Amino acid sequence: MAIDGILKQGFITTSADKFLNWAKTGSMWPMTFGLACCAVEMMHAGAARYDLDQFGIIFRPSPRQSDLMIVAGTLCNKMGPALRKVYDQMPEPRWVVSMGSCANGGGYYHYSYSVVRGCDRIVPVDVYVPGCPPTAEALVYGLLQMQNKIRLTNTIAR
């Protein structure tokens, strides 16, 4: 937490914006939107070896309970409206992590007629995690970058 000053009496002085962002980074609740093989690596990152719980990241089954969406895998044209619908059900503020080459830009199936060439054409993406499939370490690094981005966001003026 970026603390502006600590007084000798045991008080901490900081802005409300920094405090709220600190609280949000310590309690990110992602909703999994696993579409292909990248979802297996996402499950791997949530398992005991990498333990995302230590960062305050707890997977939620419902979009109404989550503030972060991880889009992992190949996004087809038929799945595009469902992705947007789930994104619209998430409460504000909400963030999106695009995981894998297929979610980032179509990947191996870029020239296929039925593939959306990047989920950023459907929903705004905050962090891109590259790889085919990206490793669990890459996803953890991307989530830590998401936490840094949230920390630097101006929450109250939003």
From Swiss-Prot:
It is an enzyme of class 7 (translocase). It is found in: Cell inner membrane. Its cofactor is [4Fe-4S] cluster. Binds 1 [4Fe-4S] cluster. It is a peripheral membrane protein. Gene3D superfamilies: 3.40.50.12280. Its EC number is 7.1.1.-. Pfam families: Oxidored_q6. GO terms for molecular function: 4 iron, 4 sulfur cluster binding; iron ion binding; NADH dehydrogenase (ubiquinone) activity; NADH:ubiquinone reductase (non-electrogenic) activity; quinone binding. It catalyses: a quinone + NADH + 5 H(+)(in) = a quinol + NAD(+) + 4 H(+)(out). [4Fe-4S] cluster binds at C37, C38, C102, C132. One of its GO terms (cellular component) is respiratory chain complex I. Coiled coil: none annotated. Keywords: 4Fe-4S, Cell inner membrane, Cell membrane, Iron, Iron-sulfur, Membrane, Metal-binding, NAD, Quinone, Translocase, Transport, Ubiquinone. GO terms for biological process: aerobic respiration; electron transport coupled proton transport. Belongs to the complex I 20 kDa subunit family. NDH-1 shuttles electrons from NADH, via FMN and iron-sulfur (Fe-S) centers, to quinones in the respiratory chain. Couples the redox reaction to proton translocation (for every two electrons transferred, four hydrogen ions are translocated across the cytoplasmic membrane), and thus conserves the redox energy in a proton gradient. NDH-1 is composed of 14 different subunits. Subunits NuoB, C, D, E, F, and G constitute the peripheral sector of the complex. This is NADH-quinone oxidoreductase subunit B. It comes from Bordetella pertussis (strain Tohama I / ATCC BAA-589 / NCTC 13251).
